[in-house]
Design a protein with these regions (language model features):
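Short alpha-helix in the Rossmann-fold core of NAD(P)-dependent oxidoreductases
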Residues: 86-93, 109, 128, 181
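SDR active-site strand-loop-helix element
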Residues: 8, 32, 70-74, 108-114, ...
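Conserved beta-loop-beta element that borders a ligand/cofactor-binding pocket
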Residues: 103, 133-151
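N-terminal Rossmann NAD(P)H-binding glycine-rich loop of SDR-like oxidoreductase domains
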Residues: 5-25
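Mid/C-terminal beta-alpha module of Rossmann-like enzyme folds, strongest
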Residues: 194-255, 280-299
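Flexible, glycine-rich beta-alpha linker
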Residues: 119-122, 143-159, 178-179
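NAD(P)H-binding glycine-rich loop region in Rossmannoid oxidoreductase-like domains
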Residues: 47-94, 99, 114-119
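Substrate-positioning beta->alpha
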Residues: 154-159, 174-197, 203-207
Length: 299
C-alpha cells in the first residue's frame, strides 16, 4: 500500500497540524487546495466546485498520484445561510467522497466536530452530521474533535484566547458554565495517523477530546491569566449576543465570531461518547501551551 495521503484544509489551523503529524509518521501529503496556482505537491480542488469532467478530473489525479487515503478537514466557515452551507459544505464533501471512492482510495477520514450529534441545534453540527452519515455508509472513519488548541492556536480556541486577553472587562455568554471538551492538536494528529492506517473503520464516530470538561468561564479565566490579564467577566444573556451577531451577518459584517458558534457553545452535547481509545489515543489534560512557552523562554 502506498503511503500517500490527500488532505483538504491543509492550509488551515487544524489541517496544518494534521499535515505535520502525517508527515512525521512517514506519509507523503498531497494538499487538495482551492488556490489558483498550486504547487507540485498539491491538487487544485474546492468545496464549491464540481469535480469536473475530461482528462484532469479529481479521481484521475488521485489515481495518478497513488493516493491511498484522503483526510477531509476543509470546511467553509464564511458561509452563514443554511442553503449555502448545504450547497457548498455538504454537497462539496459528498462529491469528494464519491471521487475518492471512484479512484479506489482505500481509506477516507472525515474531520467532523464534537458539535455533531443527533440533537445538534447549530447549523455547523447539523451539516457535519449529514456528511458523517454518508461517510459511514461508505466505510469511512469519522473523527469528532473537541475544541482544538496548541501553542499557536487558531479557529474557535484562538478566537476565545484573543477575546480573553483584550481588556479589564470581558463579556461572557450567559452563566459561563457551558462545558468545553478540549484536545491538543498533536493528539488529534495522532488519531488521524492511526485512522488512515486502519484495516477496518470503527462502527461509530470517534470523539477525540480529554474526558474532563472545562466550563467556559474557567477556560476564559485561565486564558486571560496566561496572557497576564485579570479581567472581570460580565455575564451577557446569550440570546442577546446571538441576535446581535445575526444582525451583523445580515449586514454583511464579519466580526470573527459567528452567531452559529453561540448556538454550538450553549447547546453543546452534554454526554459525548469520548472513545478516542478506539484509535489508540489518550488525549492529554488541558494546559495552556502558550503559557508554558512563556515560562520556558523566561526560565
Amino acid at each position: 500500500m502506498s503511503r500517500v495521503c490527500g488532505l483538504t484544509g491543509a492550509h488551515g489551523y487544524v489541517g496544518s497540524a494534521l499535515r505535520r503529524g502525517l508527515t512525521a509518521a512517514g506519509w507523503t501529503v498531497v494538499s487538495l487546495s482551492r488556490r489558483e496556482k498550486v504547487a507540485e505537491d498539491e491538487i487544485r480542488w474546492s468545496l464549491d466546485e464540481a469535480s469536473g469532467s475530461g482528462p484532469n478530473t479529481l479521481r484521475e489525479e488521485l489515481r495518478r498520484r497513488e493516493i491511498s487515503a484522503v483526510v477531509h478537514a476543509a470546511w467553509d466557515l464564511r458561509l452563514v445561510r443554511p442553503s449555502d452551507l448545504q450547497r457548498v459544505n455538504v454537497q462539496g464533501s459528498l462529491r469528494l467522497l464519491e471521487e475518492a471512492r471512484a479512484a479506489g482510495v482505500r481509506r477516507f477520514v472525515f474531520i467532523s466536530t464534537i458539535s455533531a450529534f443527533d440533537e445538534a441545534e447549530s447549523d455547523y453540527g447539523k451539516t457535519k452530521l449529514a456528511v458523517e452519515r454518508a461517510v459511514a455508509l461508505q466505510g469511512g472513519v469519522v473523527i469528532r474533535p473537541g475544541l482544538v488548541y496548541g501553542e499557536r492556536p487558531g479557529g474557535m480556541f484562538g478566537a476565545l484566547k484573543t477575546q480573553a486577553g483584550r481588556g479589564a472587562i470581558i463579556p461572557l455568554l450567559g452563566n459561563g458554565r457551558y462545558a468545553q471538551y478540549l484536545v491538543h492538536e498533536d493528539d488529534l494528529a495522532a488519531a488521524v495517523v492511526a485512522a488512515v492506517s486502519l484495516e477496518k473503520a470503527p462502527e461509530r464516530p470517534v470523539t477525540v477530546a480529554h474526558p474532563e470538561p472545562r466550563p467556559l468561564r474557567s477556560l476564559m479565566r485561565q486564558l486571560a491569566e496566561s496572557q497576564g490579564s485579570h479581567p472581570r467577566f460580565v455575564s451577557v444573556p446569550w440570546p442577546l449576543v446571538y441576535q446581535g451577531l445575526k444582525v451583523t451577518e445580515a449586514l454583511g459584517l464579519k466580526l470573527g465570531f459567528r452567531s452559529d458558534s453561540v448556538i454550538g457553545l450553549v447547546r453543546h452535547n452534554r454526554h459525548p461518547d469520548l472513545n478516542a481509545s478506539l484509535l489508540g489515543v489518550a488525549p492529554r489534560p488541558f494546559t495552556d501551551p502558550g503559557r508554558e512557552q512563556t515560562q520556558r523562554n523566561s526560565g
